[in-house]
């Protein structure tokens, strides 16, 4: 990728809006922008804003507010100019065309963030957090990404790296001076490796919880056919997402719907009604329903209050479960003793849905991020590389127990540092960078 040219792109989403932003970055950002602006951008101080007119070939394009950020005190570390013009498509696209005509190049997806990384303004972990911030669809995903962007994850990785480097330096001294009788069983390198292992293990153990928080808590609606599972899904999400009929066995596959409740993300899963059947398609749907129940973090067991009480599967007693007595608008549910919460609802009238939402909110509040700086891994790339670090550190630690040569232990530590380099970006390949930043939007 060329790093000595100047790039431009629209930085705001397409469509109607009050303001659109065109971003320019590179060594000629100021001179190129100056040629299409009525003011004197070349003479403006850094971090100042100026109102003027954007024109090209003697044709006025729009009135715009220009922001000037000079290198190295900018997001990319280069000279940056931003044009804030009227929203919509035409004004910003014509400004981009004018900038291209004056010598700028159209930016690639994520190229502004990539330049920030290459110029040392952010590390790769922080760069990836930018995309996570943009893609966050619930408050927990946003907070996890915000913590990562603020550098909390990077600081933990840096601590691991420092401990490994300290251990490696000590071991290399032992390798260089084998004649010295230095006891290593309880030595500094072993303790440093154990400290690094502890931090690595803590990060790895946060992955499942981080995934749950970012992607949403999975809750299955399960029960007999025609109990009202699909109707309750539609009522909660206020969408006609699931097909509803009076024919038993209408739902024959897993249907998943993301639903944000008070900023928290849930994955509501509608499933096939559980019953004995000879229909091969329905039988497969029931098998998938049971699998979904086994993997879900919670179950809404839906019962038609007007029908005989069905047998409760064992799994209801093994997971957080709420018993939903549906059709309470036409019949009062029976009084039974069960070890989980019971709520009377009506998918038809909406009765009881507020109580159900409040119960679900309590489930979701089990893990509260709040303003905490707790680190959660959510990236599969980060998890894979940290797992490699953990494996190498474990091998190095075992090397002490097995009295392996110091050179072997040092080799494991160097491999751990290599994985950390790939994680932070200090040793990452150009192909990996291309893959990561290609997922970004143009203009970011």
Curated annotation (Swiss-Prot):
Alphabetical keyword list: Cytoplasm, GTP-binding, Hydrolase, Magnesium, Metal-binding, Nucleotide-binding, Potassium, tRNA processing
GO cellular component terms attached to this protein's record: cytoplasm; cytosol
Segments passing through the bilayer: none
Record-listed (6S)-5-formyl-5,6,7,8-tetrahydrofolate binding positions: 23, 82, 121, 444
Subcellular location: Cytoplasm
Cofactor: how and how many bound: Binds 1 potassium ion per subunit.
Protein name: tRNA modification GTPase MnmE
Organism whose genome encodes this protein: Chlamydia trachomatis serovar D (strain ATCC VR-885 / DSM 19411 / UW-3/Cx)
């Amino acid at each position: 990728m060329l790093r000595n040219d100047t790039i431009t792109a629209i930085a705001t989403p397409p469509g109607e809006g009050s303001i659109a932003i065109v971003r320019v970055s590179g060594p000629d950002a100021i001179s190129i922008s100056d040629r299409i602006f009525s003011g004197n951008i070349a003479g403006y101080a850094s971090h100042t804003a100026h109102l003027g007119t954007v024109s090209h070939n003697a044709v006025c394009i729009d009135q715009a507010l220009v922001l000037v950020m000079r290198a190295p005190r900018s997001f990319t570390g280069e000279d940056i100019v931003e044009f804030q013009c009227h929203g919509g498509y035409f004004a910003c696209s014509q400004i981009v065309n004018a900038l291209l005509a004056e010598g700028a190049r159209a930016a690639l997806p994520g190229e502004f963030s990539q330049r920030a990384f290459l110029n040392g303004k952010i590390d790769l972990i922080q760069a990836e957090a930018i995309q996570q911030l943009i893609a966050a669809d619930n408050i927990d995903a946003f907070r996890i990404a915000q913590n990562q962007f603020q550098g909390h994850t990077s600081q933990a990785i840096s601590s691991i790296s420092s401990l490994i480097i300290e251990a490696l330096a000590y071991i290399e001294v032992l390798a260089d001076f084998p004649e010295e009788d230095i006891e290593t069983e309880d030595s500094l390198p072993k303790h440093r490796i154990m400290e690094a292992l502890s931090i690595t293990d803590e990060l790895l153990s946060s992955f499942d919880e981080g995934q749950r928080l970012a992607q949403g808590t999975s809750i299955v609606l399960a029960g007999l056919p025609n109990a009202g599972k699909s109707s309750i899904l539609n009522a909660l999400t206020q969408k006609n997402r699931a097909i509803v009929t009076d024919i038993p066995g209408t739902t024959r596959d897993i249907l998943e719907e993301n639903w944000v409740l008070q900023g928290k993300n849930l994955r509501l899963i509608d499933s096939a009604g559980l019953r004995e059947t000879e229909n091969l398609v329905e039988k497969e749907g029931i098998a998938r329903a049971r699998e979904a129940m086994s993997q879900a973090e919670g179950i809404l067991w839906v019962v038609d209050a007007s029908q005989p009480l069905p047998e409760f599967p064992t799994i209801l007693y093994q997971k957080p479960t709420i018993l939903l007595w549906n059709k309470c608008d036409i019949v009062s549910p029976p009084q039974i003793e069960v070890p989980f919460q019971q709520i009377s609802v009506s998918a038809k009238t909406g009765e009881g849905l507020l109580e159900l939402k409040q119960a679900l909110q309590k489930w979701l509040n089990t893990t509260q991020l709040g303003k905490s700086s707790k680190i959660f891994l959510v990236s599969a790339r980060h998890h894979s590389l940290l797992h490699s670090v953990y494996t190498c550190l474990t091998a190095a630690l075992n090397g002490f127990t097995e009295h392996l040569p110091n050179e072997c232990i040092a080799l494991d530590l160097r491999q751990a540092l290599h994985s950390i380099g790939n994680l932070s970006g200090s040793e990452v390949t150009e192909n990996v960078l291309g893959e990561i930043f290609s997922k970004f939007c143009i203009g970011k």
